[in-house]
Amino acid sequence: DINGGGATLPQKLYQTSGVLTAGFAPYIGVGSGNGKAAFLTNDYTKLTATELSTYATNLQPTWGKLIQVPSVATSVAIPFRITDWSGISGAGRTGPITVVYRITYMSPDFAASTLAGLDDATKGVSPAPSNVSDAIAQVLPPNDPSAPLDVTNPDDGVAGVQPYPDSGYPILGFTNLIFSAFFTKAFFTKHFGDTNNNDDAITANRFVPLPDNWKTELSTYATNLQPTWGK
């Protein structure tokens, strides 16, 4: 089996039946930091220059180059800084808000459904999936012909800081995949495919599928990393 794990954010998605292709062991949610460490050392127990160098020396000849690409998108949830009921439209009351219980962290995929009817303060746009898609559509996909990726740099497959979008919900991010090139063919073919892909499962788990042009470029990028695919 191919053992995979990492961040708990996409854990429910990758544990959904049919999302991972044959040959994968069940995804283990251990937190993103431990996930990187486990992947790069083949140990269930981090990507700096030293980590990448160690992988390239010890494991790349056998497992192939690293691929790091976005998998799905999600809105980013930020706590509201409202201290008085008068700051909430339609509350029908005034006076200080008393916090009885505070959630220290809530995964944005689950927060998004709660916040979908609310608007951000600067643009009046809610974090609904369609608004996240509108914002992503304004960003060039990784490996766009106008800006091809450096296949020797795994960090190049992930979009960095982008200009403020003209439309859509602007506070968003991606959960990324890190793969060895020898072990990606079947999963990439399905996950980024035109049909029979994971889009329904992605949506059901409150994430946002990548645009079609992103899927095409990411598939091309991954294919070019290894002339001969592995499993």
UniProtKB/Swiss-Prot annotation:
Q: What's in the keyword line of the UniProt record?
A: DNA-binding, Glycosyltransferase, NAD, Nucleotidyltransferase, Transferase
- Give the EC number(s) listed in the UniProt record: 2.4.2.30
Its activity depends on temperature as follows:
Optimum temperature is 80 degrees Celsius. Activity decreases at 90-100 degrees Celsius.
Query: What name is this protein filed under?
Result: NAD(+) ADP-ribosyltransferase
- Look up the coiled coil feature and give its residue ranges: none
- Give details on activation and inhibition: Activity increases up to 5-6 times with Mg(2+) at 50 uM or higher ion concentration. 3-aminobenzamide (3-ABA) inhibits the activity by up to half and nicotinamide to a lesser extent. Zn(2+) inhibits the activity to half-maximal rate but at 500 uM concentration of the ion.
Q: What does the protein in this record do? A: Catalyzes auto- and hetero-ADP ribosylation and produces short oligomers by elongating the ADP-ribose chain (up to 6-mer). Binds DNA non-specifically but with high affinity. Forms very stable complexes with circular DNA wherein the circular DNA confers thermostability compared to linear DNA.
Q: Which reaction does it catalyse?
A: NAD(+) + (ADP-D-ribosyl)n-acceptor = nicotinamide + (ADP-D-ribosyl)n+1-acceptor + H(+)
- Cite the GO molecular-function annotations of the record: DNA binding; NAD+ poly-ADP-ribosyltransferase activity; nucleotidyltransferase activity
According to the UniProt record, activity depends on pH as follows:
Optimum pH is 6.5-10.
